[in-house]
Amino acid sequence: MEKFKDNRELNRRSVKDQLANMELLADCIRAEEENGNERYNFLLKGYSQETKEHKPDHAACSAIKEDNSPNKITEKRICRCMNYYSKELAQCKNCKLERKFQNAGKNYFAAEYEVPTKYVIHRVGRIDLVIKDARSGVEYAAEINLPKKNSETLTRMIAEILTYTAGMLDKYKPAICFFEGSTQYKDFCNDAIRSDENFQYLLTQVDVFYITYTENDGIVDYVIHNHKEEPLW
């Protein structure tokens, strides 16, 4: 049985297809609520869930070596660097990663990355990044994409993070996060998408963060913004 988030149709990129998929996801959530079920039950259908609890198992960053593709940028590498980077740390000074990500903001910061679901669930991955509000202490579990060369749709991002946080909503608020200028950023600002009633409904289910950044001498100074506080539209 195909899992909702793994449906290839969710990544169709035309605006017409994106709007149709947003309607599909929104209708599924509404139907669960109307039937008195947990909102995101349908996202877990077809998964085998064990009672064994997951525990984060990644070690502290030990720096990227010269022979380990230092110019390769992946979601995991970005999130790990956002979580650990400090220009004062010896491993960061010795790290060969071509671009290092340094938080230049005050309100939000990366608190953890690659967080597993509460229980082992077959074929369900990990939460990319935990974003923490430095003022309130609220933590957001965020699905994040690369700044460039990533065509994932907003619907797929929302479906993924709602899948990963099912059963963890007492700890994390689900969110999506994208970089300024990315494909997802442009989709979010698209007039037809942002005015769609189903998309507006989905935005009541997740928070939205966007990242602005500047790069100088291999250091990416980034700031995490909350769309509710600093609206893009």
Regions found by a protein language model. Give the residues of each.
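Charged, terminal alpha-helix-loop-beta segments
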Residues: 1-233
